[in-house]
Amino acid sequence: MAQKIRVLIVDDSAVIRKLLEKIFSSCADIEVVGTASDPYIARDKLVALKPDVMTLDVEMPRMDGISFLEKVMQHFPTRTIIFSSLAKTGSETYLRALEAGAIEIMEKPSIDVSQSLETLSAAIIEKVKAVAKARINPIKAVVPNPGAPVQKVASTSLARTTHQLLAVASSTGGTEALKVFLSGMPADIPGTLVVQHMPPGFTKSFAENLDKMFPFEVKEAQEGDQVVPGRVLIAPGNYHMEITRSGAFYYVKLHQGPALHSVRPAADYLMKSVAKYVGKNAMGVVLTGMGKDGAEGLLEMKNAGAYTVAQNEETCVVYGMPAAAVALGAADKVLPLDRIAGDLLKQLQTRNAA
């Protein structure tokens, strides 16, 4: 008989603690081993109970949830899901939670939810099961002098013509994985489009933070943005991102079509459009994440002549999306996270020499 997933619930609201206990008790695979109303009680229970997964509130008495998580990850690393009211959580707090080590951030459940408790329960239980399998200590990006201003390198007019294009898919663990990946790319990075699963309102701050770290431009994509070397475009939350072609140039097309794999943006939309318009001049990468988004799109890119890579299991926080891509035969190579950028650059050199 499989071992149950042992969960510790940390929230100052007795109502939320009871609601989460009710949700978890409906699943035979999950056992609530304890609850805590503040971080100090939670610390003692973490040490005593050694849970597989901790659910954590952000706003709590005596110490906020993010500060507590930072301490937990230093001294007692634990797979953590942050439950927060995303409408109240500022984008900086959201990103800080991910940087501190949260594997997932979910909308805090409430008693007066418009969706049924059954639907809500299914989503939360699915996340807990996936997070229970996650790696706690993925590879971290080494970015020199993160506080120092980064000099941007303008693209030349020649570089603005159509050539190579890079499409990247990432989800759970992806915000940190993207930093590792991008830290290996040069200032004249090929025109790059990224789909990172994030709620609306948070992708802009994420892009702005990345822009401060690297010598190339990183921005949240807008309708009509041109895809050029030296620029990385992040799909905005709640919008699918595709590309279209006009003459020798590629442009961003945003829309709010149906969610795919329960997500919007979905990488499959992007990668299928890249396969259609760019073909063999493209490269595709699927990084860490739950589910299977990007797998079919990466396969279409490969079949169109693009070079494709999936992150290996050992360096993923959650080996879901890359596993799905590998299972379809969509990846030319399966590589550790810190080797993907270098491999793509070698591939570019080979293409340019041909």
Swiss-Prot record:
It catalyses: [protein]-L-glutamate 5-O-methyl ester + H2O = L-glutamyl-[protein] + methanol + H(+); L-glutaminyl-[protein] + H2O = L-glutamyl-[protein] + NH4(+). GO terms for molecular function: phosphorelay response regulator activity; protein-glutamate methylesterase activity; protein-glutamine glutaminase activity. It comes from the Bacteria. Coiled coil: none annotated. NCBIfam families: PRK00742.1, PRK12555.1. Residues 159-351 form the CheB-type methylesterase domain. This is Protein-glutamate methylesterase/protein-glutamine glutaminase. Belongs to the CheB family.
